Amino acid sequence: MVVPALLGTILGEWQSSIGIYLAFVGMSLTGYIMNTLGEKSPLNLKQSSIVVVLSFVLLSLFGSLPYLYINPFWEGIDPFALFASSFLESTSGFTTTGLSTITHPENLPDSFSFYRSYTEWVGGLSFVYLVMALYYPETKLAGMKYFLGSGILRFKQLLSTISIIFVVYTTIFVLLIFTFGHINILDSISLSFTTLATGGFVPTSTILNSENSITLAIIMGGMIIAALPFAFHFGIFSKNVEATKEVKEILIFLIILTLFIFLFMLIEPSFSESD
């Protein structure tokens, strides 16, 4: 979270960066206190589930601080609506849901727009699992790997898979969007972040217009790749035959995706007529 805060500092967007710094400091202190005072005992699947849920709740609460500080919604918003909207945006980011009530993100400071996409990217990076791996030995995390879509890989191998997906793929899609989409580098990074989180927090409301067909194609390809199981990516990069046995699931996913594409193509004219 310190990355978008530093970006805001460099760009001179102090209001945005201060809010993000507050979230970073609060999250770091809370994590340190809980890790210091908490008991490190072996985690079963039920306990792992509770830890993951509570971790995302805390992430979302602290992640809402920049929204509360900058108020990117509308003037005159009451405090309860401001908190609810901020918490919604933050939760939507860290859970990679991508749901947003901000209709014109292009009016936001560049660093804050980057922050929104960054929270989605961090959520897709399975930030909670990475933090857990730093503080707990692998023998105590046996139940955690099932959250990541595979029972055949060791937890450390899954972390390597996540790193490969989000570092290599992010770099590739930043270059593709910047080169062929004719979008500035900062928006290209933000768009790449949200693409690998399967969409949602775009930096501008017009970036996905139908005229940008090349950009749309790159984004769609990125979202499909990001939706594939972690174990499949691990098998591709490591040439592990056992890890690529999920081809049947992937085929079913692609068939369902194709059916819904045709369904929306059939429905789309009715929407046009209603407009």
Give the residues covered by each predicted segment.
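Membrane-proximal intracellular helices of multi-pass ion channels
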Residues: 1-275
